[in-house]
């Protein structure tokens, strides 16, 4: 059995960085009040809570459902940020564990001086509105696949009490900040990619016909958790044969047949940041001639798009680099999705308008899908955009035909 890889050095985002982010938002707000909600949770029943990514980005707090941070650039120095937490509830704490009293240790850990319980929200907002009647909407009211933002209820309540308030669209403030990753954020995503690499290498050593798609998924996700991840950053896709032509296939229960190609789209989460990796591998350990032909075409497209990445370019230009190659080969209609997306606290991270900036982290994922031949191919890497190119965070995960077959031969 191969030796266990050495433990990875664990990065983190310092408290001071969260404070800098809040300062940047305060600067963008000018004389407007901003609210960011953590979101609600049924964690008492399901044991899982993930805050709204805007809230996590500004605070680093991941275990306080219902929390709100109020940002007021018009407040006296040291009081511009107010964090409001749910009241203590002994009955809930019997089930979920004790929560900390508000005091100096908690304030220092969060790096926020003004921390109160949610019952004080009305007092805090009333104080803010004595200085300004301008209120910022920092994130959209809702999306088709999500509940309506709690902002809407807050805005309605404020408008009922203060008929002269002005609510302004400031959704670009946090979006533009999140689109450019700091060195600490890049380190977090790199770590998620490194954990993914360990898991993918182990998976490649174990895959064989007769296993199921579920077995492949379990091998990957066990590899994530045993190397410091809390699990996958999104639902793992393992599509064998015809299933590999379904972009968001998640049943993951079919058996692996000898001649199947398997499209595997999965990435580890670390500290809220996720990797997003896709590899396509042969169940038998060796590509057929036809599988190799299509695979090499997609790989060539991936390399062309990767070469096109640099600060100032657009996703359209990156997409064109792949699409030209695939279309020229006669498979343009079999590449029916975009080339990639931003990556960060969300797997499809927030995407502001305009060209890419240095520090953005994006995916590149061309594909060709041939349901009439019972297979598809997609290959995906994660890269950091630099001034004159990019840094590939997932280059260590086998990608060439030779590298994949070599890794699978070690089983």
Give the predicted meaning of each segment.
Residues 1-411:
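Active-site neighborhoods and metal-handling regions in enzymes and metal-associated proteins
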């Amino acid at each position: 059995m191969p030796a266990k890889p050495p433990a990875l050095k664990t990065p983190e985002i310092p408290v001071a960085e969260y404070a800098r982010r809040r300062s940047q938002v305060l600067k963008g707000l000018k004389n407007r009040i901003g609210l960011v909600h953590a979101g609600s949770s049924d964690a008492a029943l399901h044991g899982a809570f993930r805050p709204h990514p805007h809230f996590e980005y500004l605070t680093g707090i991941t275990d306080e459902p219902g929390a709100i941070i109020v940002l007021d650039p018009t407040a006296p120095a040291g009081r511009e940020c107010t964090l409001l937490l749910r009241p203590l509830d002994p009955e809930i704490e019997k089930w979920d564990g004790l929560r900390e009293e508000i005091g100096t240790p908690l304030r220092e850990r969060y790096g926020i001086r003004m921390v109160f319980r949610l019952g004080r929200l009305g007092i805090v907002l009333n104080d803010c509105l004595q200085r300004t009647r301008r209120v910022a909407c920092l994130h959209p009211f809702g999306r088709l696949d999500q509940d309506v933002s709690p902002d809407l209820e807050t805005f309605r309540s404020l408008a009922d009490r203060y008929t002269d308030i002005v609510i302004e669209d400031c959704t670009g403030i946090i979006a533009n900040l999140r689109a450019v990753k700091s060195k600490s954020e890049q380190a977090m995503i790199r770590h998620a990619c490194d954990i993914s690499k360990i898991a993918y290498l182990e998976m490649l050593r174990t895959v064989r016909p007769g296993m199921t798609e579920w077995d492949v998924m379990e091998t990957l996700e066990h590899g994530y958790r045993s190397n410091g991840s809390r699990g996958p950053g999104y639902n793992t896709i393992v599509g064998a044969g015809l299933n590999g032509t379904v972009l968001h296939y998640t049943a993951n229960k079919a058996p692996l047949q000898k001649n199947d190609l398997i499209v595997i789209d999965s990435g580890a989460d670390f500290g809220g940041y996720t990797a997003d990796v896709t590899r396509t591998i042969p169940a038998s350990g060796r590509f057929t001639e036809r599988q190799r032909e299509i695979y090499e075409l997609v790989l060539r497209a991936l390399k062309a798009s990767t070469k096109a990445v640099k600060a100032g370019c657009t996703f359209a230009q990156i997409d064109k680099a792949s699409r030209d190659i695939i279309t020229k080969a006669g498979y343009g209609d079999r590449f029916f999705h975009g080339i990639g997306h931003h990556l960060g606290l969300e797997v499809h991270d927030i995407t502001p308008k305009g060209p890419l900036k240095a520090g953005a982290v994006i995916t590149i994922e061309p594909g060709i899908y041939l349901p009439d031949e019972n297979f598809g191919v997609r290959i995906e890497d994660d890269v950091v955009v630099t001034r004159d190119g990019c840094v590939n965070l997932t280059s260590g995960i086998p990608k060439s035909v030779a590298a994949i077959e070599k890794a699978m031969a070690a089983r």
